[in-house]
Amino acid sequence: MKAPTVLAPEQQKDKWQELLAFWCWFPDLFLDACTPKDPETGQKIGIELDPSQRMFMRSMFRFERTYHCYSRGWGKTMVELLTNYTKCVLVPNTQIFLTSSTMKLAANLIKQKHAEVLRFYPFLEGEIEKASLRENGAYIIFKNGSRIDTLPNSQDAKGNRGNQICSEESALLTKAVFDDAIEPIVSEPYKNQRTQKRHPYIVNGLHFITTTYYVSTDAYRQNLNYAQEMIDLDGSAIFGASWRLPIAFGRGRREADVLKIKTRVSPLFWLTNYEERWIGGSSNSLVDTMTLIKSRTLENPEIESDGKNEYYMGVDVARSENDGNNQTSIVVVKTLRD
């Protein structure tokens, strides 16, 4: 029997560098290599990533900017966390921020899926130094210096610095907040830990994961910009799919169960959360949808007339036999006269 060849330390280092570079380009294959197997049957235990999930992971490693619009039930948060955990393991001293509308929502995303991630990939538990999963903020510290933290999509995120942002429900993110508080977080490039020079192959990332919304929002315009940058090979990529994609790969609910939901919800909810269609009449409307929605909430509600101004009431009476769309809407408008 031929004895195995033992490589010199320098040769071993070269091989490990090649393998690390390969896994950074194909992070899904790294998880495949680390997937536990049944000791008796030899069959893999846990998740078998499908092509759409593999594309998701690879895009977040390879591109500086990505926008993902997937339906409910696609498994966005789970695959997003798998990608972030994998990057933290493969790239030492990486700082990743997971953001959402509020700090509580961002923390809950990790809190709900952390145990599930470790159950499917037990090796990750040995890579984690400390994990704090609280409602007012969550963080995970890895033994190689990498870290995942949570932030809100608001001005409260200002001043932080990191290498990657994953923004959940980013359709609600306005351009003003993005430009002022979110984008500057990844302004500093990832540096080689030994030389402190810019790393030539590790890029900072801005990644957005959401369901669709109105075309008259900053998020839709950002999608158009990323689409053009994708055409120009300028570091961006966009992806999207309806509820049919996970079903086609045998994941999630059955088709009949999803179609039952359609009968219970409004048409707009169905289009944006399951069909993944951007809705609305014009992407260049005079009134921004997010500004209009924000104006619907009064800081100090008026319970009765002040006797000085005029009030108008508009009523849209529901006439649908469909319970999901049988909702009457009432709008009260106050007119301020000069």
Predicted features and spans:
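Phosphate/NTP-binding elements of NTP-utilizing enzymes
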Residues: 2-315, 332-337
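Short acidic, Gly/Ser-rich segments with clustered Asp/Glu that frequently serve as metal-coordination loops
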Residues: 317-325
